Curated annotation (Swiss-Prot):
Top-rank taxon, per record: Eukaryota
PROSITE patterns xref list: ZF_RING_2
ZnF locations on chain (RING-type): 537-575
Predominant cellular place of this UniProt entry's protein: membrane
Lineage: Eukaryota, Metazoa, Chordata, Craniata, Vertebrata
Name under which the protein is recorded: RING finger protein 145
Organism: Xenopus laevis (African clawed frog)
SUPFAM superfamilies, per database record: RING/U-box
Pfam families from the UniProt entry: TRC8_N, zf-RING_2
Location relative to the cell: Membrane
One of the record's GO molecular function terms: ubiquitin protein ligase activity
Membrane topology listed for this record: Multi-pass membrane protein
Transmembrane region(s): 53-73, 77-97, 123-143, 146-166, 168-188, 225-245, 275-295, 316-336, 340-360, 384-404, 410-430, 460-480, 482-502
A GO-annotated cellular component: membrane
This protein's encoding gene: rnf145
Amino acid sequence: MGAKEKLEAMLNVALRVPSIMLLDVLYRWDVSSFFQQIQRSSLNKNPLFQYKYLALNMHYVGYILSVVLLTLPRQHLAKLYLYFVAALLLFAGHQISRDYVRSELESGYEGPMHLEPLSMNRFITALVGQLVVCTLCSCVMKTKQIWLFSAHMLPLLARLCLIPIETIVVINKFAMIFTGLEVLYFLASNLLVPFNLAKSAYRELAQVVEVYGLLALGMSLWNQLVVPVLFMVFWLVLFALQIYTYFSTRDQPTSRERLLFLFLTSIAECCSTPYSLLGLVFTVSFVALGVLTLCKFYLQGYRAFMNDPAMNRGMTEGVTLLILAVQTGLIELQVVHRAFLLSIILFIVVASILQSMLEIADPIVLALGASRDKSLWKHFRAVSLCLFLLVFPSYMAYMICQFFHMDFWLLIIISSSILTSLQVLGTLFVYVLFMIEEFRKEPVENVDDAIYYVNGTYRLLEFLVALCVVAYGVSETVFGEWTVMGSMIIFIHSYYNVWLRAQLGWKSFLLRRDAVNKIKSLPVSTKEQLEQHNDICSICYQDMNSAVITPCSHFFHPGCLKKWLYVQETCPLCHCQLKSLSQQAVAESGSSTNPVVEQSANNPPQEPLSAVAATTETLGTVPTCSALEQEPTMDIEPAESLVERRGELEVHVSQEEANSNSNEVLQRILTTGKVQPEDLNVKALPPESEVCAGI
């Protein structure tokens, strides 16, 4: 984005802030109480009181004008502000002319000005002021007809011509009337401009809704108005004005405790309307986004923005603040009560920010521990941030317990802080395990089990804390004050933080238990089998001192195969289904005998030949699995699909065809004593026990 685009974006926000401030002022202004005060006072004869109903209607007209100013396009909004500046300049010229005429009346001198130094000074000052006003007006209105704005110079010209003072007063009034007529002419000539703008805007909105829909229209207006930045700037202006007002009326220095109270009170003062509350929500969102961005920058440097240029974070904290403010009725409270409640809500927001920081830091710290990066600065940044996330939530929970009375919301804050500290502790423990494994020459076999136990312990504690929060919330709902919003929060908390976590943990436990049972059911290889196999583990590519043998005759480390079985229940090489002892017993009881084997058993060869024996021995050594099975691949179909394909073959190959096929091959081998290549293309089916089919 260039400098021009940045300037236009800043102007787009700055020009719309006054419309939000006008809406805020109109919301604060109670018209009914204002006129009641006038009625009780001696001003009930005031013309404003006589037209109070017109004033009430103008109050609503002010809302409409504010919305119009808020939604105007930037070019038209800039023109409107320029016209407003020109009107202010004309008013300044009128004031300069009126002050000059008044000072001349008070002096009573009507002679030549060069003979009276004070009169000459007054004339020069008024002349310079009028020239500046005329020049600025011509620049603002972008016209070279400077005489249009020089009507207020007529009293100066009259004084220069030695016209009497009484006549100069009349000339000044004429100049004022002439300027007013110019303004009225300008307004009349542009009277249809708002109507034309509204007509064109309605036409464009109708086209957008017809083509893209209401949602696209809302998103387009949201982006064009830059609503989050607009409300944030509006709230910051309010907050700065509140702080300035306080310090401008105080002469004594403020203590540290007083500054904290001033900070909370000023925030509470800036949350008395829905518009200021929205401003605080977006401000908190941007503050959270800035903190999380700094956190990621501290951990990864500029690489964080290269990998993740758009961080859509921070809205969670803002929405949390908005929900809590609406649920507790923050706007309707008094300033002191609002400041107290706002401090609790801000504690909840800070706890949410800390949890988001941990979500950013956790994968980065674990990846750094598992990698071979030996940069001490990177490790220091990761560990220091984890230590901060370990200590600060605990300190915050301690301070809450010290200064506040315990209730449901404070229990949620404390539980969130404790869980954050526990999760950081688990992350540091896993990081230490990774670093220990890094400095060891041989890998630690049970490091994954230790990591699982650490994470499982944290998840169990997290589940128990969530369960305690739900129990406390239910007890407060039953025996205390019942609210719909509180019940909804308890229900949502119970579903997401209790029920779903319990389901996920139980499913993980069942998968690990099933994997352990499968590993125990597999036979352990002997040293002779390992020497005969003479291969490495196909999962970790390390030498095997001990291994288990799958039903498809593949060798793996027990720990490596167990990790694989945590994810899926197939062989890593051939993707055959690996079943436990109970599953194998059920499968064997339901299996049928292969018809080719039965036929060979009923009709054995009567005259075994040496060539036939050699041939059968050679065929017996042919591996049942192809060479593609020597590396794990995910492109091979699992065993279920192989069984389905075998079923398709059984549909096309009948029992008699298979028997005649095998008999013809055996007779040809017995008569010729040789095996032809076409003899290997037999349509007989393999036995069911041979799960590893050819690929």
